[in-house]
Amino acid sequence: MEKAVKELHRVLKPGGRALILDTDWRSIVWHSSDKARMERVLHCWDDHLADPHPPATLGARMRRAGFRVLRVGVVPMLSPRWQPVSYAAGIMKTIRGYAAANGERHGLSKEEVQAWYDDQLRLAERGEFFFSLNRYAFLATR
């Protein structure tokens, strides 16, 4: 992350603005019938990222690189009910694919990953689906 922020500062003209939007997966609130399984699936998902929690340190990293951070805002991704065309629906499929392919390193079988996915669909059918995840927007100038 340090290298990317420094490179952004290098290529941006003096006075230029940068907007970085990133997710902190610790902010997730996702209803599940099996909380332990949900934790295992999300722990597996964290492996696909170099850092699953960058917003907590991004502002300081940007300042160290020479940026002036003007504003930090939160962009919630909220699905209080099932919506087939939504971030939640899309990320469910993506996580299922990743966890099915990489879950064995975390003790997750393909069947357990599918059970996680099916649980979410059952919750949706019963009107009990809930998903929320925060993204953070950092506006800065060089």
Regions picked out by a protein language model, each given a short descriptive name:
Residues P55-G59, Q114, S132-Y136:
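Short coil/turn segments at secondary-structure boundaries
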Residues R71-F129:
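C-terminal helical/coil "lid" or tail adjacent to the Rossmann-like core of SAM-dependent
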Residues A65-R68, V85, A89, L133-R142:
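Core SAM-dependent methyltransferase catalytic element
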Residues E2-R17:
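A short glycine-rich, Lys/Arg-flanked "PGG" loop and its adjoining helix->strand segment in the class I
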Residues R17-P84:
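Conserved catalytic/acceptor-binding region of the Class I
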